[in-house]
Amino acid sequence: MLKAMFGLTLAAGMALASTASAHGPSRQKTQMTITLDASPTEVWEVIGHFDDMSWHPAVASTEMTPEGAPVDVPDESTRVLHLKAESGDPTITEQLMKIDPDKMMYKYMITDVAVEVLPVTNYSATLQVSDKDGKAEVLWKGGYYRGFPNNDPPEELNDDAAVAAVTAIYQAGFDALAERFGKVE
């Protein structure tokens, strides 16, 4: 009887262990803020247009698709970001999910990107400008999964690679805004 109970306990433990290791990736989150030496309205005027990402140094051009599509209609406005690159035409396609000009905020999601360009899947983010003692505080936060959805991802598609890539994008954008407006320490 004792052997049978030990066997059942061992089998149950092994089943639980294999289930725990087979859960797949966890949603990652990146949230960054910067306070700029400008009014919130001045900064929103630069970054609040879904059809214009020219303020970000990685973006060569922004194209609304299809041509003539609305620029500020949630679930309809779609942009294609053409990225600066030495070869090829890497792109990221994003759809507007929500926009609130009064709150100086919009939410968007990536609908198409090659993991070689950005090693993430199911990415959505919010970009918002708030007033902080008369200065502009910019919040950029996103949630996403790594580029490889299964267990044992290659190094370039793991959680660390996804977080590093998104952090680098946000930081490059913030650095460009700080250069343009000045950063409040």
Regions found by a protein language model. Give the residues of each.
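Hydrophobic pocket/interface hotspot
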Residues: 42-47, 53, 79, 96, ...
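Amphipathic hydrophobic-ligand
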Residues: 26, 118-124
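Hydrophobic ligand-binding cavity/cleft-lining segments
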Residues: 20-72
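A conserved amphipathic terminal alpha-helix motif
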Residues: 133, 137-139, 143-185
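Bacterial N-terminal signal peptides
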Residues: 7-15
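Glycine-rich portal/gate segments that line the openings of hydrophobic small-molecule binding cavities
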Residues: 35, 64-118, 172, 176-185
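Positively charged n-region of N-terminal signal peptides that target proteins for export
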Residues: 1-5
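Short, low-complexity Ser/Thr-rich regulatory SLiMs
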Residues: 98, 127-133
